[in-house]
């Protein structure tokens, strides 16, 4: 055998080894393929968004009894959307446009096709429709998209305010029992869990009151204000320390977001994320007790939840349950329902959703959006829903930071209870989501 013959054998042997390796590698890849999550394609997104940053709901004069120091003036009237709030929302809108264009949901440039983008807002307070409009303007500047909302002279929109208009009946005894169950039997005991935050707030306010003090003390600071339930025609409210602390903590937050000088944020005593964040604890507790118990959440949230499901599941009969005033066209690829923190609290209470945001102390931040993103598996046509909370961090709001794909807002994938089976990359099968929604509806509470 010649040297050339030996070389040929070695080459042939090498080729055979390479071919065998390729066959083994291909077989291994084929064996692994069933374990790989299929690539899902985004085909629709349904938003539930809170309005943007506003001024306090009270005038400085109305707030005066709560502190020894004067409250600062604001450039707009009480409870109005501020220019900072509009700017933050248009920034968010621009980010959503970029993100969803990259995913193929929205056009990268120009205006969307008619009927593919829709927004419907609560009509009770002006800041909500204005917030929805700022979102649309940020997403599609110059396109003239208009927010829909019910005529304000016709009263509250039943979709967002079903208990207030009598569409959904709420039993005061049942609502009171639901709140006390969530508080483990005692509102004051529940409030003690936030005692450190309340004490820090009292050290800022420096005011003592003689009303509603626990243990009938002649006077006390906000950390020792008592809490009581008061029933009315539109439900049950928690009056006392938690409600007062909710107002105060949120007003300090509004000062921080608005960009007030540090000396004017809680009079300089809570002007950093580290000192401000704990003061939002009582507010989160207040909403958890007053709005998220399932009985209360279902009465306040069922019409809106039906509309969300109808928009999300537009290929099924469920879409026929969507209330006519806020019903988006079936062709809509992006639908935004815009309301208040109480609406987010009601829907999350109904669905059993929970989260904690490490860089944002407000559980339901202004401009925060719970997005129900519908995806499809091109291989088998099955649909899934991924719930994502988008929000601006405390520092992004304070500094009005520009957002883009390289500098995104906060993003948290929210897990729905009962979605372990069949979940793909945080997305739950649409039939499972549908059943979860339907099980949470109040049977005696129709659509809006």
Q: Where in the sequence are the language-model features?
A:
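Bacterial N-terminal signal peptides that target proteins for export
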Residues: 2-17
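Bacterial N-terminal signal peptides
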Residues: 15-26
């Amino acid at each position: 055998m010649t040297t050339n013959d030996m070389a040929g054998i070695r080459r042939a042997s090498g080729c055979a080894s390479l071919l065998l390796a390729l066959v083994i590698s291909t077989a291994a890849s084929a064996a692994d393929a069933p374990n790989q999550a299929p690539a899902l394609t985004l085909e629709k997104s349904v938003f539930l968004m809170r309005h943007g940053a506003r001024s306090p709901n009270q005038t400085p004069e109305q707030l005066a009894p709560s502190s020894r120091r004067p409250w600062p003036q604001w450039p707009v009237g009480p409870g109005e959307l501020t220019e900072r709030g509009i700017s933050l929302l248009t920034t968010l809108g621009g980010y959503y446009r970029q993100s969803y264009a990259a995913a193929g949901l929205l056009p990268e440039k120009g205006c969307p096709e008619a009927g593919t983008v829709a927004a419907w807002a609560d009509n009770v307070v002006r800041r909500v429709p204005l917030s929805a409009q700022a979102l649309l303007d940020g997403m599609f500047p110059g396109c003239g998209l208009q927010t829909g909302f019910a005529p304000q002279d016709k009263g509250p929109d039943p979709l967002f305010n079903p208990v207030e208009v009598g569409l959904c009946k709420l039993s005061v005894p049942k609502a009171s029992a639901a709140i006390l169950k969530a508080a483990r039997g005692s509102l004051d005991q529940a409030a003690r869990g936030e005692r450190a935050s309340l004490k820090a707030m009292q050290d800022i306010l420096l005011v003592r009151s003689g009303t509603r003090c626990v243990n009938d003390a002649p006077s006390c600071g906000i950390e020792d204000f008592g809490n009581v339930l008061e029933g009315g025609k539109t439900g049950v409210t928690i009056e006392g320390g938690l409600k007062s602390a909710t107002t105060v903590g949120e007003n300090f937050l509004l000062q921080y977001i608005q960009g007030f000088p540090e000396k004017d944020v809680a009079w300089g005593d809570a002007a950093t994320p580290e000192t401000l964040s704990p003061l939002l604890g009582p507010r989160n507790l207040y909403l958890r007790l007053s709005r998220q118990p399932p009985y209360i959440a279902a009465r306040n949230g069922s019409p809106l939840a039906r509309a969300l499901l109808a928009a999300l599941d537009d290929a099924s009969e469920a879409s026929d349950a969507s209330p006519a005033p806020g019903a988006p066209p079936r062709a809509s690829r992006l639908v935004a329902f815009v309301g208040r923190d109480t609406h987010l609290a009601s829907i999350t209470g109904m669905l059993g959703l929970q989260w904690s945001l490490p860089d944002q102390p407000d559980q339901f931040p202004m401009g925060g959006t719970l997005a129900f993103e519908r995806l499809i598996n091109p291989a088998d046509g099955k649909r899934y829903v991924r719930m994502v909370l988008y929000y601006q961090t405390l520092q992004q709001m304070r500094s009005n930071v520009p957002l883009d794909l390289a500098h995104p807002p906060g993003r948290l994938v929210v897990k729905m209870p009962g979605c372990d089976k069949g979940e793909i990359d945080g997305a739950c099968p649409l039939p499972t989501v549908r059943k979860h929604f339907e099980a949470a509806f109040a049977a005696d509470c129709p659509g809006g």
